[in-house]
Design a protein with these regions (language model features):
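Active-site pocket-lining/capping segments in soluble small-molecule metabolic enzymes
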Residues: 2-121, 139-143, 147-233, 238-541, ...
Length: 681
């Protein structure tokens, strides 16, 4: 029978113990920086070693999260952190950034790699790419339905992990820039400010339009087991130990077809109940909810009862003891478990004043293993001369023996290499970068754009206007949809084959699945902002994958942008209403679905500011910043090209903005430098 894994969050030591004692098979945790929950208490590199030891002795695996984006200035610290994680003996590392992948492969090639949900694997192609890169496990995107997970499971051999309980991000994982753009705290760097939980209103004036209920798939866990998902993950490294215990206990019971306490699970934490909308493919208004006063107060009544789930230490390991007492020699205790044996010596036994030490009394004293992970199963007792040993001396042997056995069993070693991050040198580029034009609609096209080096249009927009487009005197690139689910992959390949016949051989993608699809179609691959490239190692990694050029993340400051150096040509956005959230559950839907929706609407924040919201073929929606980026007045050295990212603008507005740049003028109207003048935390 397949062994399924319950994977629990451990934001700190107490949560870790709650997870283990409640029945988790594995925990995931973060150390200091470089993890997606930097505001959790987390673990130091020293406490990590103790955490790994504690878990290993209780047959629980530890996965360390290094699932954030890294800047060049942090590469040295990243390499040091990777070495400490390898020394701890952790069972795997969960990663997002390909710089972290490189560091792990150079320092500890034996360490298993798990692809974080931040890598946005939502199709077969993305899973295959990570499988080819040597990942042993992939954490699938939260937005997938059961049938979509099944399709991925059918095509890849790597382990698959799925979130089954906890908070739902409104955005597709790895594609949210809301927190960063509105402040200095990036979700891609573990410091999400949860701006989506504030009171956003949609076109129907419905409040909290970006706040989803927490997910709970426990009632459908057998369906996930049936399709072959390997690991069931609970979200919640920021939550209290009672929550962790309740979630683990409930999941365990659900997997064993037992009744679990739904009321307690909802009371300890929820946002007006739970949803399984994504799993069922029912992405409607019932998925939305926010944390109400009664959700907060209901937790108080269940916390005390939930403590009982993790109050007592578990002792899963059978131990066998052998105690030898001989004249004029120190007492010897052998303590064995799981194929390992500890040997300790103690006091010299004495002639008894009354009665010798009996096997029964020795067993009783040696059985008091307390907070250790062992229980005494048998004792082999040798006392040929009828000697005695004080209870305190027997207890000391027991403590030392258990401690030594813990040290032996709790250790796991990897081969570790003393690798260092490479030193990069600046690469000279053209005095003024080449320009690219990205249009949302072909109706925005102007002859002025023939001065650009490249024109980018959505794949479907090219197909609608193929006869006109194939006659244009400018190079064309097809932008793949930002989200391509398993049921759409073959259709995308067919569309690429059609435009290839018209001479279009360049494709733009911001997702690793898109890279795999474009390779399969025989296209030149241009990486966009969605790849989240924030350092030189990541840039090199995408170059090694065969990309022709890359657009760097717009979460980079001007200084960080200039620090990136690699052989692959690179660019950045110079203008545009930046896409700050990519979502599959539509916030604009009403009880009547998409009725009367044009697909070009706005969402309004609590200050009354409107943010453009564009629907893409009813497959997904994109929230754009309320103010357009413009950095044409900055000295963007070290870039090969800059891209004008046009979305909601009219043709005339597009012309004016591009013309202003070409004539060294600043376009009229409100604009922002974005994060170019700010350094993210």
């Amino acid at each position: 029978m397949k062994n399924f894994e319950i994977l629990a969050p451990a934001g700190a030591e107490e949560q870790l113990k709650a997870a283990v004692r409640s029945g988790a098979n594995a925990v995931y945790l973060g150390v200091d920086n470089f993890n997606a929950r930097r505001n959790a208490d987390n673990f130091t590199t020293d406490s990590l070693k103790e955490a790994v030891k504690y878990c290993r002795l209780r047959n629980v695996k530890v996965y360390v999260t290094l699932n954030t984006l890294v800047f060049d200035r942090e590469l040295e610290e990243l390499y040091k952190t990777v070495k400490e994680i390898a020394r701890s003996g952790a069972d795997a590392v969960i990663v997002q950034d390909f710089a972290t992948v490189r560091a792990l492969k150079e320092i500890c090639p034996q360490m298993p790699l798990h692809g974080s949900t931040q890598m946005a694997v939502h199709n077969v192609s993305g899973a295959k790419l990570l499988e080819e890169k040597g990942f042993s496990r992939i954490v699938l995107a939260r937005e997938l339905s059961l049938e979509e997970m099944k399709a991925i499971r059918k095509e890849v051999g790597t382990e698959l992990e799925v979130f089954v309980h906890g908070a739902h991000c409104m955005s597709a994982s790895g594609n949210c820039y809301l927190s960063a753009m509105l402040g200095e705290r990036s979700g891609n760097r573990g410091l999400c400010a949860q701006g989506c939980r504030l009171n956003w209103k949609n076109r129907h004036n419905r409040e909290y339009a970006l706040s989803l209920k927490d997910m709970s798939y426990l009632d459908r866990i057998n369906s996930l087991m049936k399709i072959g998902i390997d690991s069931f993950k609970i979200e919640g490294r920021m939550k209290r130990p009672e929550y962790v215990a309740a979630a683990v206990d409930s999941l365990k019971k659900a997997m064993e077809n037992q009744v679990y306490d739904k009321t307690a699970l909802r009371s300890v934490f929820s946002r007006n109940g739970f949803t399984d909308g994504y799993l069922q493919g029912k992405r409607d208004v019932s998925m939305f909810g926010y944390r109400m006063k009664e959700d907060v107060t209901s937790a108080v009544g269940v916390l005390k009862d939930l403590e009982s789930l993790y109050k007592n230490e578990i002792r899963p390991n059978k131990a066998d003891a052998k105690l030898i007492l001989e004249k004029d020699k120190p007492a010897v205790l052998f303590l064995s478990s799981k194929g390992a044996t500890a040997k300790v010596t103690g006091e010299i036994p004495q002639e008894p004043r009354t009665a010798p030490l009996s096997e029964e009394i020795a067993f009783r004293n040696l059985s008091k293993l307390g907070d250790t992970p062992f229980f005494l199963d048998s004792l082999e007792f040798e006392n040929p001369h009828g000697l005695t040993l004080p209870a305190a001396a027997v207890n000391a042997l027991r403590r030392e023996g258990a401690n030594e056995l813990e040290n032996i069993l709790g250790e796991k070693t990897y081969g570790i290499f003393d690798a260092q991050p490479p030193v990069f040198s600046d690469r000279e580029t053209a005095e003024k970068p080449k320009t690219r034009i990205r249009l949302q609609r072909f109706s925005q096209y102007s002859e002025d754009f023939e001065k650009a080096d490249l024109l980018i249009l959505p794949l479907d927009e090219i197909l609608k206007n193929i006869e006109k487009i194939e006659c244009l005197p400018v190079k064309i690139a097809a932008e793949l949809p930002a989200l391509i689910y398993p049921e759409d992959e073959d259709e995308v390949l067919k569309k690429l084959a059609k435009i290839k016949k018209s001479g279009i051989v360049r494709g733009v993608t911001g997702n690793i699945g898109g890279i795999h699809l474009l390779k399969k179609a025989g296209f030149r691959i241009l990486g966009s902002h969605g790849l989240n490239i924030t350092n030189s190692l990541s840039a090199e990694a995408y170059g090694a994958m065969g990309l022709s050029d890359i657009t760097l993340s717009f979460e980079l400051s001007e200084k960080a942008l200039k620090n990136i150096s690699s052989d692959i040509p690179r660019g950045a956005y110079i203008y545009g209403y930046l896409p700050i959230m990519l979502m599959r559950a539509c916030p604009q839907k009403s009880e009547n679905g998409c009725l009367d929706c044009t697909g070009n609407t706005v969402l309004t924040d609590r200050k009354g500011i409107d943010f453009p919201f564009l629907c893409h073929n009813k497959k997904y929606g994109v929230l754009h910043n309320s103010v357009p980026l413009y950095t044409g007045d900055k000295n963007l050295r070290n870039l090969d090209f800059v891209t004008f990212f046009f979305t909601v603008e009219s043709k005339k507005e597009c012309e004016k903005i591009y013309d202003a740049y070409l004539n060294n003028k600043i376009p009229e109207g409100r604009k922002t430098n974005g994060l170019l003048s700010r350094e993210l935390l």
